[in-house]
Swiss-Prot record:
6'-bromotryptophan modified-residue sites: W17, W36, W37, W43
Modified residues (4-hydroxyproline): P23, P39
Localization per Swiss-Prot or TrEMBL: Secreted
Entry GO MF terms: ion channel regulator activity; toxin activity
Protein name, UniProt field: Mu-conotoxin-like Cal 12.1.2h
Key words, A-Z: Bromination, Disulfide bond, Hydroxylation, Ion channel impairing toxin, Neurotoxin, Secreted, Toxin
Recorded domain comment: The cysteine framework is XII (C-C-C-C-CC-C-C).
Keyword Glycoprotein: no
Any GO CC annotation of this UniProt entry: extracellular region
Length: 44
């Protein structure tokens, strides 16, 4: 699923979140939540 919401600098969708700032700036993209860039990734 695509991370389509930006809250507090984090891209949030379907229980996952990604930091938009370096060094995890590539965490969220049109393909969704790229977990390997996100140490704090959460799933439903």
């Amino acid at each position: 699923d695509v991370c389509d919401s930006l809250v507090g600098g984090r891209c949030i969708h379907n229980g996952c979140w990604c930091e938009r700032s370096a060094p995890h700036g590539n965490c969220c993209n049109t393909g969704g939540c790229v977990w390997w860039w996100c140490p704090g990734t959460k799933w439903d």
